[in-house]
Amino acid sequence: VAKELIKYPFVEKIDVVETDKMFVDVCRKFFPEVACGLEDPRISMYYDDGLRFLRGKNDEYDLIINDSTDPLGHTEGLFTKEFYGSCYKALREDGIMVYQHGSPFYDEDEAECRKMHRKVYKSFPISRVYQAHIPTCPSGYWLFGFASKKYHPLNDLDAERWDALGMKTWYYTTNLHRGA
């Protein structure tokens, strides 16, 4: 995620929180195309649990992206009501949180998606789910979550402002945004 964010010159600061330093070291060594950019001066690396990292942070972030694995083992804390409440507090008044929501394709996973959305909805006044087709994910059909204190992902979309940036992206377009 950080690799993509550093492409935008207006991004001033990125805090990357990873529980496993060895994972990052292995990626740097064997998958440099994935780990590239981590030396960018705008990036600060923290090796910590995401929930513990966010506790006590208030009004600090414009955007929180949770690109966690499944809610198993050491990442379970990133799928709790406490975590989403901590994200809410850590975001500025106009901040946005986006996160992996999983695949609703299989019955058990679909139930987890619903459970997760209910937890987020209890913390954020605006909480929506969007979809993408990602062939490398189980079932190829994946959901993501959008949560905000202020912005609705469709009603507040400023397509003209985005288009005026002239940003060339591989996947995202404002039409796709509306359709997802």
Go through each PLM region and give its residues:
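Active-site-proximal loop/turn and secondary-structure-junction residues that shape catalytic pockets
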Residues: 70, 103, 133
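Conserved beta-strand signature within the Rossmann-like core of class I S-adenosyl-L-methionine
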Residues: 94-101
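Conserved Class I S-adenosyl-L-methionine
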Residues: 84-88, 110-133, 145
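Soluble small-group transferase modules, centered on the S-adenosyl donor enzyme superfamily
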Residues: 126-180
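Alpha-helical structural signal in soluble globular domains
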Residues: 4, 8, 119-123, 149
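Residue-level detector of family-conserved "landmark" positions at structurally sensitive sites
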Residues: 16, 38, 101, 129-130
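The AdoMet/dcAdoMet-binding core of the Class I SAM-like
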Residues: 1-94, 106-113
